[in-house]
């Protein structure tokens, strides 16, 4: 498996993040989602890395060029990211603010925030190598958030209702497999390392459950071998998807889905939905014109093949070498949102 160059290319701009919740609003006419909380990596990060001493940040042009006002907010894309779309789809809010944004309004606290940190992962080595917020440290931020929420709401029962009726959105594992695992292949087999990632996910979910969380939407990894960063590794003539890397991602996703099915029987009152990111994105890659895409192998921006950003990011499945474009998220989000509504009702 040729992970090494992919690992290098993802170092500055990779991703992971957890979940969400809605405040006294109805979705599908049956369930009140109080808030959305997101944890994990750059698929969900809305700006938590901006003030960190890390290269894994994107609060600069051309990032955000299609965002409201053309502003680079620290989101890893050309516009809104996946957590924003889930928040809007669940009728919570249009944009999910970053918890570590110094300008965060206390009025945003009751309807949820994002704790995710681009470049992070379940493995502590992933986060430390990137200089970003490790997922368990994001949970510490959530604990601090609850204290602040108590100060804003000033009603313990209402706070408990917000926490228990929220959706927790989690995206973790992408960077562990793409960045960290290539450095550990002599120490771990694919089977043992993916088992570790699932165990760490299990610990994460149980930690949040102990703090009152009950509704979990957990994302699988992307088809990592089809990221532009993987396609453009040295010697990959034809820029095809790297099947061995996709196979590793698929192994983790299968184990993660099975674990979530098992947790239903272990944690009373909790609900879990596995969010398949792998196959919907792979479908866009394999059938691009059906959704109006032209380029599936390159990023619109920020690659050796595109030193000048493309004029129209909506024609690209990927914005840069590791992150889907806003249009890709918009294309796959509706079915995922319906699945979350159905399974977390």
Curated annotation (Swiss-Prot):
<keyword id="KW-0732">Signal</keyword>
<keyword id="KW-0964">Secreted</keyword>
<dbReference type="InterPro" id="IPR008265">
    <property type="entry name" value="Lipase_GDSL_AS"/>
</dbReference>
<keyword id="KW-0443">Lipid metabolism</keyword>
<dbReference type="GO" id="GO:0016042">
    <property type="term" value="P:lipid catabolic process"/>
</dbReference>
<protein>
    <recommendedName>
        <fullName>GDSL esterase/lipase At1g23500</fullName>
        <ecNumber>3.1.1.-</ecNumber>
    </recommendedName>
</protein>
<dbReference type="InterPro" id="IPR001087">
    <property type="entry name" value="GDSL"/>
</dbReference>
<comment type="similarity">
    <text>Belongs to the 'GDSL' lipolytic enzyme family.</text>
</comment>
<dbReference type="InterPro" id="IPR050592">
    <property type="entry name" value="GDSL_lipolytic_enzyme"/>
</dbReference>
<feature type="glycosylation site" description="N-linked (GlcNAc...) asparagine">
    <location>
        <position position="103"/>
    </location>
</feature>
<dbReference type="InterPro" id="IPR035669">
    <property type="entry name" value="SGNH_plant_lipase-like"/>
</dbReference>
<feature type="signal peptide">
    <location>
        <begin position="1"/>
        <end position="24"/>
    </location>
</feature>
<keyword id="KW-0378">Hydrolase</keyword>
<feature type="active site">
    <location>
        <position position="320"/>
    </location>
</feature>
<feature type="active site">
    <location>
        <position position="323"/>
    </location>
</feature>
<keyword id="KW-0442">Lipid degradation</keyword>
<dbReference type="GO" id="GO:0005576">
    <property type="term" value="C:extracellular region"/>
</dbReference>
<dbReference type="Pfam" id="PF00657">
    <property type="entry name" value="Lipase_GDSL"/>
</dbReference>
<keyword id="KW-0325">Glycoprotein</keyword>
<dbReference type="GO" id="GO:0016298">
    <property type="term" value="F:lipase activity"/>
</dbReference>
<feature type="active site" description="Nucleophile">
    <location>
        <position position="42"/>
    </location>
</feature>
<dbReference type="InterPro" id="IPR036514">
    <property type="entry name" value="SGNH_hydro_sf"/>
</dbReference>
């Amino acid at each position: 498996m040729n992970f090494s160059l992919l690992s290098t290319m993802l170092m500055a701009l990779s991703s992971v993040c957890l979940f969400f919740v809605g405040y006294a609003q109805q979705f599908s006419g049956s369930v009140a989602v109080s808030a959305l909380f997101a944890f994990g990596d750059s698929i969900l990060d809305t700006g938590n890395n901006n003030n960190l001493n890390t290269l894994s940040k994107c609060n600069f042009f051309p990032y955000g060029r299609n965002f409201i006002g053309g502003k680079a907010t620290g989101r890893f894309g050309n516009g809104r990211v996946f957590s924003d779309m889930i928040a809007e789809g669940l009728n919570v809010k249009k944009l999910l603010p970053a918890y570590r944004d110094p300008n965060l309004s206390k009025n945003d606290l009751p309807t949820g925030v994002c704790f995710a940190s681009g470049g992070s992962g379940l493995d502590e080595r992933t986060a430390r190598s990137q200089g970003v917020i490790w997922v368990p440290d994001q949970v510490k931020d959530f604990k601090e958030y609850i204290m602040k929420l108590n100060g804003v709401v000033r009603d313990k029962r209402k706070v408990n209702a917000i926490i228990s009726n929220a959706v927790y959105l989690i995206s973790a594992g992408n960077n562990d497999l793409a960045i960290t695992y290539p450095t550990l292949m002599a120490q771990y087999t694919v089977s043992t390392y993916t088992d570790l990632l699932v165990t760490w996910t299990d610990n994460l979910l149980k930690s949040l459950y102990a703090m009152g969380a009950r509704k979990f939407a957990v994302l699988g990894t992307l088809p990592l071998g089809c990221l532009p960063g993987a396609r453009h590794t040295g010697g990959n003539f034809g820029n095809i998807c790297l099947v061995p890397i996709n196979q590793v991602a698929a192994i983790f996703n299968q184990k993660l889905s099975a674990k979530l099915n098992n947790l239903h029987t272990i944690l009373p009152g909790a609900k879990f939905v596995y969010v398949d990111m792998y196959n919907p994105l792979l479908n866009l890659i394999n059938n691009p014109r059906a959704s109006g895409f032209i380029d599936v192998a390159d990023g619109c921006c920020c690659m050796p093949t595109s030193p000048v950003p493309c004029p129209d990011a909506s024609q690209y499945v990927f914005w840069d070498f590791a992150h889907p474009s806003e249009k890709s998220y918009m294309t796959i989000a509706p079915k995922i949102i319906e699945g979350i509504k159905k399974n977390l009702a």
